[in-house]
Curated annotation (Swiss-Prot):
Homodimer. Interacts with ALB3 and ALB4. One of its GO terms (molecular function) is DNA binding. InterPro entries: YbaB-like_sf (IPR036894), YbaB/EbfC (IPR004401). Keywords: Chloroplast, DNA-binding, Plastid, Transit peptide. It comes from Arabidopsis thaliana. GO terms for biological process: protein import into chloroplast stroma. It is found in: Plastid, Chloroplast stroma. Its main location: plastid. The lineage of its organism: Eukaryota, Viridiplantae, Streptophyta, Embryophyta, Tracheophyta. Residues 1-48 form a transit peptide. This is Nucleoid-associated protein At2g24020, chloroplastic. Participates with ALB4 in thylakoid protein targeting. May function with specific subset of thylakoidal proteins. Binds to DNA and alters its conformation. May be involved in regulation of gene expression, nucleoid organization and DNA protection. Disruption phenotype: No visible macroscopic phenotype under normal growth condtions. Increased number of plastoglobules (lipid bodies) in chloroplasts. The keyword Plastid applies. The gene is STIC2. Belongs to the YbaB/EbfC family.
């Protein structure tokens, strides 16, 4: 009879390895301790540990020499490829910004009485006003300066968009992508 009780307890422990079973408890009255249950505001919650990326190859024999870890097996390679692409884009973007900062765009008013020069980053560099524009009065001069500034700004923006579009195409992006971001 003692061997029968030992066999029953052994069988129960094999079937329910994460349960506490007292000697006289039945299978229905067992209290499971795994997964751990925690009481929260909305009731009990359980904590489980699940393998997300497959597992290791136990026999270390692989047909193609690579570890097969389920559907995410090549995740590290994809991550490294994305990181390299980001680095290339950052380097190219910095180079384009430096080129634009060095470029100068001149804008003129009607009659070319006022000339405004902007950088490729739309930073004002200088304003040239002729003697003839000075004689027109402050109100008219203000309009001419504004007109010249708008002309220079428009030229700078067009050049910047063209340069960014060229950059996007050199990186393999579709040519019409930048037009949709207006």
């Amino acid at each position: 009879m003692a061997s029968m009780a030992a066999t029953t307890n052994f069988t129960k422990s094999m079937l329910f390895p994460f349960s506490h079973v007292s000697g006289n408890a039945s299978l229905n009255s067992q209290r499971r301790t795994w997964p751990k249950q925690y009481k929260s505001k909305n009731g009990y919650r359980s904590l489980r540990v699940n393998g997300l990326f497959g597992g290791g190859n136990k026999d270390n024999n692989s047909e193609d020499g690579q570890s097969k870890a389920g559907i995410f097996g090549n995740m590290q390679n994809m991550y490294e490829t994305v990181k390299k692409a980001q680095m290339v884009v950052q380097v190219e973007a910095v180079r384009v910004q430096k080129e634009l900062a060095a470029a100068e765009f001149d804008g003129y008013c009607a009659g070319e009485l006022v000339k405004v020069t902007l950088s490729g980053n739309q930073q004002p560099i200088r304003t040239d006003i002729t003697e003839a524009a000075m004689e027109l009065g402050s109100e008219k001069l203000s309009q001419l300066v504004t007109e010249a500034y708008k002309d220079a700004h428009a030229k700078s923006v067009v050049a910047m968009k063209e340069r960014m579009s060229d950059l996007a195409q050199s990186l393999g992006m579709p040519p019409g992508l930048s037009e949709g971001m207006k």
